[in-house]
Amino acid sequence: MPQRIGYIFDQICTLDNLIQADLEARKNKKHFGVYPYGIRIFDKNNVDNCLLKQLLWQLDTETYENQPYTVERRKTDRKWRDLYKVNYYPTHILHHAVMRVIYPYLTSRMTRHSFAGIEGKGTTQAADLLKFYLKDKEGTKYFLQEDVCKFYPTIDQDVALSILSKVFKDRKFLRLMDKLLHHTPSGLQIGFYISQLTANYMYTLVDRLITEKLGAKYYVRFCDDMVILSNDRCFLLKVHKEIKDLVEKVFHQKIHDDYILSRIGYELRNDTHRKRQRGSKGKKYRLSRLSV
């Protein structure tokens, strides 16, 4: 088992890290050559990095407090979702500052089967891996697909912190993460920069259950959407039960009752696949276009 990592807070709490976090946080934010209002106000008031120095002092003295947020109801992928928005300064910059430091530590401990919140590993790469798996026609006669009910809103914040504490031993950092994860009354929220990677890393436990303990050969996960291929239907039923038990007992979440277990009827396109179109029918990531 890898050793826990220390001295994380000291890497986060530097002026240089906050400056770089600001630069990363504003990437691709210009509309018609103009930054949004929050960034413009920050730039106007951040003379000689005075605001970043103030944030640095708050972090160092542990006096930082979570700021108000807004919630916008929006329909995406045929579902209504609550999108949470925080102020650019200090919250969004701080989220980037934290992720800049912990990202390599978390991603290095993930398995190759995970495809969310990781640079260079999105839906296209997940579909490519599925296509590669499907070349073994005898070993991929059946597929199991399932996901978690209301994934982000039902994440247990204390469980998320507990899992992070198995990677990091820096108490000051863990106290900061405790505050950031508990920004809202419950769940990890869509729109918070720290949410996706944190949630994705949590489910590394599921990845290791499926591939190491149960020995599944063909498996792909995009956040909470999981696809397992096999030539044994009974094995997939066992996998479903084990996943369900782990998700309920450890994460205190629930697998959708309408999971799919079916014989494969046709493959993904051999040479190309189109990017999912907004508003299209079917599963969110089109990883299961496998059954008739």
Describe each model-derived feature in a short phrase:
Residues 55-79, 169-183:
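Reverse-transcriptase-like RNA-dependent polymerase core
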Residues 1-53:
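Non-catalytic, polymerase-adjacent accessory regions of viral genome-replication enzymes
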